[in-house]
Amino acid sequence: MNNKTLLLTGASGYLGQHLAVRAAEKFELYSAFGANPSGITAGQPVQLDLGARAAVHQTVDRLRPQAIIHAAAINPGSGDAVAMQRINADGSRYLAEAAVAVGARLVFVSTDVVHSGLTPPYTDNAPPTPINDYGRSKAAGEAAVAEIDPTAAIVRTSLIYGLEKMDRGTDSFVKRLESGQTLILFNDVIRNPVWVESLAEALLKLAELDFAGILNVVGRQALSREAFGRRLLAYWGIDTNNKVQAGHAADISATIPLDLRLTCTKAEQLLQMTLYGVDDVLAMNGSKNLNT
């Protein structure tokens, strides 16, 4: 029987689904969701409105978890600036308050988008320079967590992908291709994609460590969105029918950070693990053809 208790927010999301399965092996797990519990893969489902301060405090006080991994967020495309502020900034503040009140270890999942993309590569302690609503809301969440709970771990990560279940980004690419649209992938947007299994392992390790502060947890290989997208489409065996073209984000919007390369040597040393790049992960896992 697991004696340690863990509250996982965002448990019905892509990262949360992978985290929950792993976490349930080590913890008595409470899997928090906002509105729809259908994506919960493990743990005891708990409905939680992160934007309601009283509800957050009451839920955490009732469950009294020893650790909290805060993976819930409103991402671009799933909510506007108001929703992002409510959940990503205010909700993170409320959760940090509640964690301190019950003495819970807090691990907050943040993003590389807190940076502008103008001065890469970004070290773990590089100050935020957000240029869009999502980045500003997550930077505000970071600041609140650091102020309220200086012992918390703040994890900046990047594009998350998996090879058992198609990630949200690749799935959207496939839907566009299937509808006959031409898919434009940016070759001037650079990221360090992270394998969901690596990220989940890192977060669970941090839940049991006393590291405090900001830690970059990303794959060690930097790729353009075009190169990354083409690799994953090939892995899943998707016939692109020459419908994939390179594009330039800089020509479209001034609020898309271009080069968000992050360093990850500190995380690899602290967590004693290799944060594999995309090519290494694909080589270890072969390919999956959905057309057969």
Name each model feature, range by range:
Residues 185-190, 215-223, 270:
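Glycine-rich Rossmann NAD(P)(H)-binding loop
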Residues 143-191, 198:
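NAD(P)-dependent short-chain dehydrogenase/reductase
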Residues 3-26:
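N-terminal Rossmann NAD(P)H-binding glycine-rich loop of SDR-like oxidoreductase domains
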Residues 87-92, 137-138:
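Short alpha-helix in the Rossmann-fold core of NAD(P)-dependent oxidoreductases
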